[in-house]
Amino acid sequence: GVKKLEEVVKDNSQIMSILCGHLHRHIQFQWGGTTVQVAPSLSIERTLTLDNKMKKEYIDEPTGSLIYLYNDQLGLVCHTDYFGEYKKYSYSRI
């Protein structure tokens, strides 16, 4: 179960991160001595609920994905990419 998996993760320091998806919400937390990251949805997002008593609904937020790169100097690097057409601005306007 969950406790056994947590023990395995804790006992294997080479595990840099646990990556998963399909909760329709981008979530990141520490567990078993490593970072767990849930990718955002590719289709529709759920409203942010911080406990099980809050109403669960879907919301029309930008969808996206996580892009991971491994770098010998930095290790695992993650970028979030949102899908859609958004207005772009040049640096001179900022």
Residue ranges and their predicted role:
Residues V8, H26-I94:
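Binuclear metal-dependent phosphoesterase catalytic core
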